[in-house]
Amino acid sequence: MSIRFAAAFSATLLAAVVLAGPAHAHGGHDHGAPPTPVSNSIAPRGEALSDAFELTAVPRDGKLTFYLDRFRTNEPVRGAAIEVETPEGPRTATETADAAYMLPAPWVAKPGNHDLLVTVTAGDVTDVLTVSLNVPDARAAAPGAAMAQPSPTQDALTAASTIVGGLKDRLVAKDPVLVATAAAAFLLGMLVVVVARGRRGVPAVALIAIAITLTLGTAAFAHGDEDHGKPAPAMPPVQGAALIAPSEATTDLAQRLPDGSIFVPKPTQRLLVLRTTMTEAGTFRRTVELPGRVIPDPNASGVVQSSVGGRVSPPPSGVFPRLGTKVRKGDVLAYVTQPVQAVDVSDMRQRQGELDQQIGIVERRVERFKKLSVTGAVAQTQLDDAQSELTGLRDRRAALDRVRLEPETLIAPVDGIVAQAAAVSGQMATPGAMVFQIIDPARLWVEALSFDALTAAQDATARLADGRSLTLAYQGSGFADRNQAIPVQFAVKGDTSGLRVGQFVTVLAGTDAEQNGLALPRSSVVRSGNGQDIVYEHTTAERFEARPVRVVPLDGTRVLVAEGVGPGKRIVTLGAELLDQVR
Amino acid sequence: MTMLAPWALTLAAGLAIAVPVHAHEVVGTGPNGGRVTDAGKYHVELVAKDATVDVYLTDVDTKPVPAAGFKGTAILVVDGKPARVALTPADGSRLSGKADVPLKPNPKGAVQLTAPDGTSASGKFN
C-alpha cells in the first residue's frame, strides 16, 4: 500500500517536474491580447492607459468614439487633441459636446484586430497610446449563439472544457516536444504504478524514471522561449448574455457581470460623475470635532466707550460712521459733551465774575506801573510781577471757558470696520457704555470648546455650515474649565471673507493618536447588501470591482482603510452609491 | 479508494500544471542596444539616434524577421511634442525612418507596424 502511494507520488512528481519544466523555462511573457471581456450585449471596445490618461475607443456605425479621462481622477479631459494613426493615414478626432472625441472610421467595420496609435495632447502633456480593437466577425458569432441557452450543468461543463481545451490548444500549438513530454510523463506514471503493484525492481524503475526525466526535461528546457500571439481563450459563455440574440444591436448598458465586477460604459460614468482617487498609505492623526465660534482677534479689534456721561454729537464730518465703515486708528468717531449741572453753572459764573474783576484790576495796575517804571517811581520788579499775575489770571479765565466748551473725543483704537454702532445724535451716553465696536475683518479667531487636551501647536480646520473649510492656526488654550470644557483659540489663516463674528463653526483638530492606513473620503465607502463595507476599485477603463474593506473613522470627511485595499489603487470617491445600484 | 487515489493524484498534478503563466510587460535591451517591447506577435527593438529611428523586427524566438513588405509608423514624444516618423523597410530585419527633429536617446512613444498580410500590431515604449 505504502509503496503504491510512493509510486503514485513519484509519478506525480515526475509529471510535475517534466510538465512544469517548460513553464519555468519560459523566460518571457505572454503576448495575449488584453482580456476581451464581458457579454454579447456590449459593443467591442479598446482601451489604453498611461500614467496621465485613460483612453477608451468604441467603434460604432462606422465611427470611432474616443473617451479621454484623467487616469487618477477619472475626470473627462476636454479640449485635447487626439490624432489617430489609421489604415488611411493620420486623422484627427473632433471633440463633441459631451467631451467625447469622434472620428469617422469606415475601416473599423472590417472584422479582425485593429491596432491604433493614438497621440493625445492635452495642455502640456503629450502621450502616445496604443489601442487594440478587436471587432468580432458577425457571421462567426452566429453559430456560437445557436447552441445557446445551456443549462447550468452544461455551463459548468463548457467552462471545464474551455480550460481543458485551452491546455490542449497550448499543448498542440506549442510544440511536439512538450506534448511528447506530457505523454511520456503520463506513461511513466502508469509504468511506475504497474511495477509498484508487482513490488519488484523498484530501484530499476527509479533509475529509468530519472533517466527519462533528465532526457525529456532537458529537451523541454532547451525550448527557452515563450508563447506568442495565441488568441486569448474565449470567455465561458454567459448564460444571461447567451439569451440575447447577437443580431440585436448592441446597447451599452451598465451591468453587473457574472464575475461580480460592474461594467459601466464611459458615457454612463460621466452621467454618474464617477471620480476616483489613487490610494496612498500614510500616517494620519485622529481628529476630534469641536463646537466653535468666530471671535475677533483681540489684537485687531476694539471697542469705543465714553469715559464720561454726556451728550453724543457727530464728529467734524457731521455724520457718525455707519456699520461697515472703514476706520483708521485715531479717527474721530464722535464727541461726548458733558452736561453742566445747575449748581456747577452758578459756581462757574461766580468764579468767572471774580476772575474778570481781578483781571480788570491787574490790567489797570500794569498800565499804571508801565508809565511809572519809565520815571523810576516804581521798581521794574513790581511791573513784572503785575504782568505775570495778569497772564495767570487770563489763563485761568480761558481754561474756565474751555472746560465748558470742550467735549470728549471718541477715537478709533484700531484699524478696521465698524462692527457695532450705537451712536445717535443728541443721545446721552452713560460712562462706560460701548458706542462703537471696531473689528479688522481680515483678522479673525475661532474659539472652540474642547473636552480633550489638544496638542499645542496643532493646526486644525474649521468647517462652516455651507461646507467651506478654514485653516486654523493654534493660538492657545485656557486652563480654566468652561462648561466642563477648555476654551481653545485658533487664528483663521487665509481668506476670511464671508465670516462674521459669533458664527458657529465645527472645528476639526488633531489629537495625539496616530493611525496608519489609506485615507479615503467617507463617500467612497458603501455598505453592501450583506452589511459589509465595500469600496469600488476602478480596475480597467470601464470596469469596477467591489472590494470589502475594514474602515475606521478618521475625521469628519475621511475614513481610514485599515485593510482590504492596498496603495496605488484607483478607488471611486464620487458616485460609489450609484455604482452600487447597478444590477 | 485504494485503486483510485494514485490516479487521482496524477490527474490533479496534471491539472495544476495546466495553469498558464501570467502575462506581463516586457522591457529589455536588444542586441542593437535599443529597447525591446511587444508588438502583437513580434518583438520590436527601437533604436533612436539623432534624427534616425531604426526598428528591428524579431519573432517568437528573437529570430530576425525580414522587414520587406512591412510598413510602419513611429510616434515619439520630443520635448512634449509628438514627432511622427514613417518607417520603411531597410536591410534585413530593419525598418528605418527620419524624424524632423533630433531625438533624445530613449524617447517615449509607440511603434505601429503593418505586416505584408495587412494585420497591424503596435508596441509602446515608456
Language-model features: where?
Chain B
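Intrinsically disordered, low-complexity terminal tails/loops enriched in metal-binding residues
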Residues: T2, T10, G14-N126
